[in-house]
């Protein structure tokens, strides 16, 4: 099914390339190599999934039926090898950012609490200004509130 989808998608891309004469079309070698790589990836994925099913069946059939408690502990120890695709790696990189850190442990100290009245009453704070929306050239930053008092151009 997925091979058929790949072939139809590549035929569609080839047709779009044929209609646009101003762009260079891909050489035949690169298109053939792309098709071959996609088919090989699909076949490899199917083989790995079939092998995992076979390994699980063989693993469960070799255990004796009388050792139910041992079977439960063995099932928890058996973890199939997962193939990490580029999408999973991208998601992993996305959530392992250096800008924030997620933790399950309880912090040793509570964060410091500042009263806003004390902060505003302090005469040393001169740069306190109301927040206002950014007007940036880039669309992704338009309409966001600035988190600092200084202004910078994007």
UniProtKB/Swiss-Prot annotation:
Statement: the UniProt record of this protein carries the keyword Transmembrane: no
GO molecular function: growth factor activity; nerve growth factor receptor binding
Protein keywords: Cleavage on pair of basic residues, Growth factor, Secreted, Signal
Positions of the propeptide removed during maturation: 19-134
Coiled coil: none
Cellular compartments annotated: Secreted
Signal sequence region: 1-18
Annotated S-S bridges: none
Any GO BP: nerve development
InterPro entries, alphabetized: Nerve_growth_factor-like, Neurotrophin-3, NTF3_N
Recorded GO CC terms: axon; dendrite; extracellular space; synaptic vesicle
Keyword Ligase belongs to the record: no
UniProt function note: Seems to promote the survival of visceral and proprioceptive sensory neurons.
Family, per entry: Belongs to the NGF-beta family.
Protein name in UniProt: Neurotrophin-3
Organism expressing this protein natively: Cervus elaphus (Red deer)
């Amino acid at each position: 099914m997925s091979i058929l989808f790949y072939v139809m998608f590549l035929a569609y891309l080839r047709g779009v390339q044929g209609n646009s004469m101003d762009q260079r079309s891909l050489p035949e070698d690169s298109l053939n190599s792309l098709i071959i790589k996609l088919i090989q990836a699909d076949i490899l994925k199917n083989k790995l999934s079939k092998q995992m099913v076979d390994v699980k069946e063989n693993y469960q059939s070799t255990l004796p039926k009388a050792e139910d408690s041992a079977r439960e502990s063995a099932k928890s120890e058996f973890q199939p090898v997962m193939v990490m695709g580029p999408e999973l790696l991208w998601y992993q990189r996305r959530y392992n950012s250096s800008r924030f850190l997620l933790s399950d442990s309880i912090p040793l100290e509570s964060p410091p609490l500042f009263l806003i009245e004390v902060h505003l009453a302090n005469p040393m704070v001169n740069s306190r200004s109301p927040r206002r929306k950014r007007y940036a050239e880039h669309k992704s930053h338009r309409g966001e509130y600035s988190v600092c008092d200084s202004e910078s151009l994007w």
